[in-house]
Amino acid sequence: MSQDKLQTIDQHAPEAEAAPYVLEELRGHVQWLTLNRPRQRNPLSSGMIAALSSAIAAADADPRVRVVVLAGSGPVFSAGHDLREMSPRPGETHDQRAARIRRILDDCAAMMLGIVHSPKAIIACVQGTATAA
């Protein structure tokens, strides 16, 4: 099966359509953010990065939240960047791919800086693998 067909199948899987990338649960003053793509090992895809960035910003702005805990669903915290998303696309030039990957990496760096500069304590509850974390 070609890489393009695999990517299309993954993007259209029921889990990908229905489930949020990040589960959010406030327990007392602790905001739990759980990466929610266990079948794919919770990769840092564009969607996951955007959802985490948004959830962290919301927790930062919420006066009820004192602590944020990042967790992963399933046996792995995160397998790192989504390599399928980084793969060349049909008809894409080298420069187009480089620009697309640069956007993904820039968004990820901004998310990481959001964690570093958060006014809230952020704790990672890591189980299993945590690649490129």
Q: What are the residue ranges of the model-derived segments?
A:
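Glycine- (often His-adjacent) and acidic-residue-rich active-site loop
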Residues: 72-114, 130
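Conserved CoA-thioester-binding segment of acyl-CoA-metabolizing enzymes
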Residues: 2-73, 113
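Residues that form or flank phosphate/diphosphate-binding pockets in enzymes
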Residues: 43, 78, 133
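Gly/Ser-rich catalytic serine loop of serine hydrolases
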Residues: 124, 128-133
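Conserved catalytic cysteine-centered active-site region
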Residues: 111-124
